[in-house]
A protein has these predicted regions:
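Extracellular polysaccharide-degrading/modifying enzymes targeting complex plant/algal/animal polysaccharides
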Residues: 1-193
Length: 193
């Protein structure tokens, strides 16, 4: 099948659905008091009696960033990658108020690939935090031989970023979807209303 645009047209093929019913303001204590009045909240759309669960959100044609520890593209270096224990150790200073974040994920850069791992637990031990992950991704991450994260490499250890927690919603253009309710939180950019 070949799809072509008519002359001077700019078609968009999308499986996206509009999120409507936005309300400004949020009283969730996981968001800092200073930001609560800036956050917009909406219920996710439903299809076939199921709430739409999404990993991407677009606002006015621009991809919004899932709530993250750092701005898009910024990452921190891990301390250890332990296949026997199936853990990754990171600086405890990167944990902040996240030990109880229910939907927290870790993005791990490992050579030419990335892994997105759902965090199961965080054990803070002094200046280090040992992180365990849910299955099946824990087994997949630690059992496959290549590419695993680099520890002690010429250019340093592999990098990571923590994402997908309401506690991380702190920058304009970030969003978060709460499960199982499906509630979507969005911190608009300055040019958005």
């Amino acid at each position: 099948t070949l799809i072509r645009a008519v002359e001077n047209a700019h078609p968009v093929i999308s499986g996206g659905v509009a999120v409507t019913g936005w309300k400004k303001g949020c009283d969730d204590p996981r968001i800092t008091k200073e930001l609560r009045s800036k956050i917009w909240v909406a219920k996710a759309p439903s299809f076939g009696n199921r709430i739409v669960e999404t990993r991407q959100m677009w606002v006015d044609g621009n991809k919004a960033q899932r709530a993250a520890q750092f701005p898009d593209g910024v990452m921190e270096r891990m301390i250890d990658f332990n296949p026997e224990e199936q853990t990754i150790t990171i600086p405890a200073s990167q944990i902040g108020n996240l030990p109880n974040a229910r939907q927290l994920e870790m993005i791990v850069h490992q050579r030419w690939a990335i892994a997105i791992l759902r965090v199961k637990s965080i054990d803070v031990r002094g200046e280090q935090a040992v992180i365990r992950f849910h299955e099946p991704e824990s087994h997949l991450e630690f059992a496959h031989p290549w590419p695993q994260p680099v520890i002690g490499g010429e250019k340093g250890n592999s990098s990571f970023c923590l994402t997908n927690a309401l506690e991380l919603l702190d920058q304009p253009g970030e969003w978060f979807q709460e499960y199982p309710s499906g509630t979507i939180y969005y911190y608009p950019r300055s040019e958005e209303d």
